[in-house]
């Protein structure tokens, strides 16, 4: 089941012989409280979370789960990617042609692929695919994490199906569209984290669920002045949280 993917008790503080236990911008992903009830994990996770000295999450779904489990409110922070400047680690690219970056899980529908191809052709953009291979769509880039950041920063446009694809787009002030996958039943969805992030920066219009919205969304202007102001305030809040809790170790 998708809700069990990547699960490890150690991620929730189990068997950690630490003086102080804290989380920073953690997330349950698409897992909801009712999933934990169905899987029989609520009692165990409640016990784990009550042992934390400080709890921080990155989305309201996770915040709600922690509160349902423990009765306690957690801090609410942006993804850690926003909190660090990676510039000195990012290589300079020798890629000369303007490109459309597709940062997505494998298996984009043929309808989305066709729309993306037409958009790229209309704007004379090369299509470069990152993260997941897209059969018949552009060039797949098998690169290092810091090379990826350089490519995201230099992209003309970004299309993504992921939370972190949207994070990179915001961090580097890109014109982008985020394809949302609404969860059905106990299957996978990306709207818990993705929708929460875009709502926070008032960019819900960049989230689409139909191929015909790609062109309009990629061409829409984004006021990054207000977005960056909000992100900078949240980053400061996150750093203050970290500093305050690190002091407790002294």
Report the location of each language-model feature.
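Active-site anion-handling motifs in enzyme catalytic cores
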Residues: 1-250
